[in-house]
Structures are given as structure tokens and as C-alpha cells.
């Protein structure tokens, strides 16, 4: 949810530098802000320098974030549903900030074609293009995994086995009953059948779950296998998870069955070593050369 919004005018023609600086510094102090996202559109370089040169009472990192598709989101039905009381400029700013916090969760709200990747996207079969783009987004979402207690309907829709109505039912159930404590509670969601549960459960994460496996990519069907591994090693599942030395002693051949083969067991061991691992790397702060301000400053290297 949006806690606060302000509009500042540090650049010409208003040149309200001091007033803008005071507003930003106060917001950083009040809300204990650690990072600031700046859209890469008009006056982004000037704004980045303005924000970076201010003095704060804490360390603040400044990031320049792509605005591609933000204007389309801000005028969309999704944005109106999320923030009906704000205009398109505020919605666009919210989207840019959220992209820094969790880019995947925010970008799924935008038609991939709106991001404008590739200059020939309008020359190809639009049906095939949409299918391919949707498959790519779905693949990314399922590879990363989704926090069951914070994900929006738009993010849940891309989880394998879930559609728009099921995603909305999950959000409604969460709103009415509070956060999920276990993956098994998904079975209580209206109109979410056993087949849908089977397909989606392994991609949904619950960080504070009582069973640590609920925050991993291990599917509930494989929980008994992990429990047996832990029992054989005379430790708990919690002690086994993230213990590379213990996991390294496991002989997968002992746990093969007709339904659990070598590939599945290998995936389980990899997940036990690094549960809930995120394939995305840590964000890096990219600094622009301060000497380059106009096209005339660009020289041959």
C-alpha cells in the first residue's frame, strides 16, 4: 500500500531546490528509507544527481529504474483497481518504486508487448507472439517462486495450475482468514481442486511456515522422502535444510521408488542445500559518468 506521496519541483522552471530537498530528507527520516528509485525518463540524470547529493540521517542508495510500460500500467484497469484514489502520475511513480523492490511482481501486470522489446514485434504473428511472451513470463514466475502471503492476483495468475479466478480466490481467502501458515491450507480455498493444488504447490512459498519445506521448491508429495532422509540421518528436517555437509552424505539410490526417480531426488538435494534459492542476483548500483550531460560530451573512446 502507498503510505505517502509528495510532488517536488527541483528543476527549471520552478527551481524549488531547497523545498524539494527538505521534503525528500524528511521522507527518508520518517519512513527510514534505504533505497530510492528514479525513472529513467525525462530529467532522470538531473534527478539522480539531486537525490544522490542530498544529506540523509542514514545510508540511502539511489537506483535508476526503467520506465518502459509504466505509463501503460498507470492508465490500466489493474492500476485503477489498486489505486482508484490516485491519478496516473502517482500510479506510475508507485510502479517504478515497486519495480525496484520486486520487478517480477510488478512487470507481470503489464502486457509484455508494451515493454517494447525488439523493433519488429509488430511484424510477426501477434497470436504466436502473445503465446510465446506469456509462456516466457510464466516460466520466469515459476522459476523464481511466489510468496503465497504477499503475491497479488496478477502474479498468482502466472503460477502453473492457477488461472485468474483461482488467483482471486486465493487473495480473497487470504484477506478473510489471514496469512497462510501451510501449503496444505490451499486446499481450503474455494474452487481450487486437487489437480490445481498438485500443479501449483511447489511454486508457492511461505517464508514463516511451521514446516520449513513450505518455503522451498520441494513439492508436498516429496515431503515424506525428505522426512525419511532426516530420520535416517537422526536429525530434524529443519536441521537438514541448508546443512551442506549433511545433505552431501545422502545416497539418493536408497530413496528411489517408482514415482521418485534420480532427477527428482537430485532436485530435492539441490533444494535442501539452498532452500528457496532465488536465481536472480543482487541488484547493483550503476553510476553514470558525471562529466557527460549532453550529447556533445560524448567522445570517441
Task: Show the residue positions of the predicted features.
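Phosphate- and other anionic-substrate recognition elements at nucleic-acid/protein interfaces
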Residues: 1-134
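Active-site proximal loops enriched in glycine and acidic residues that flank catalytic Cys/His/Asp
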Residues: 6-7, 40-42, 66, 150, ...
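Signal for well-folded cores of large energy- and translation-related assemblies
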Residues: 25, 29, 52-55, 175, ...
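Long, highly charged, low-complexity intrinsically disordered interaction regions
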Residues: 72, 81-179, 194-230, 267-289
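Alpha-helix N-cap recognition
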Residues: 181-182, 294
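Conserved nucleotidyltransferase catalytic core and NTase-mimicking acidic/glycine-rich helix/loop elements
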Residues: 186
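Structured C-terminal cores of nucleic-acid metabolism proteins
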Residues: 231-301
